[in-house]
């Protein structure tokens, strides 16, 4: 797996997790779509997932455009059900989430927000 750090907004970063075997990817906290979209298109990446760690705009601002452009699935905490639009996959504390590419354990870390993972 390769991890690319993409600068978003003035002082935030998104992380693109890329399976080097097939170029499938998951973007974490796309605060805006433009820099993420540019990297994905320039590098012929197949965006499958958008993982949001919490509902603040500087972490979800790029969701809509990226979801619609790539038909990517949005993953987020079930506690952000009412705060993040169009969540496709709800995550809960302690859950092991996996597909044929990615696998991770969900850890709830409320404090910054109640739905923070």
Predicted regions and their residues:
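Short acidic loop-to-beta-strand element that houses the catalytic metal-binding Asp/Glu
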Residues: 14-16, 96, 116-117
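Active-site HxH/HxHxD metal-binding segment of metal-dependent hydrolases
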Residues: 25, 32-108
């Amino acid at each position: 797996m390769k991890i690319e750090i993409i600068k978003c907004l003035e002082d935030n970063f998104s992380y693109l997790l890329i399976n080097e075997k097939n170029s499938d990817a998951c973007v974490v906290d796309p605060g805006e779509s433009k820099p993420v979209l540019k990297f994905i298109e320039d590098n012929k990446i197949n965006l499958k997932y958008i993982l949001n760690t919490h509902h603040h705009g500087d972490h979800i601002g790029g969701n809509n455009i990226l979801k619609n452009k790539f038909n990517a699935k949005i993953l987020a905490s079930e506690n952000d059900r009412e705060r993040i639009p169009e969540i496709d996959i709800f995550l809960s504390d302690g859950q092991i989430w996996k597909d044929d590419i990615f696998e991770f354990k969900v850890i709830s870390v409320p404090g910054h927000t109640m739905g923070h993972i």
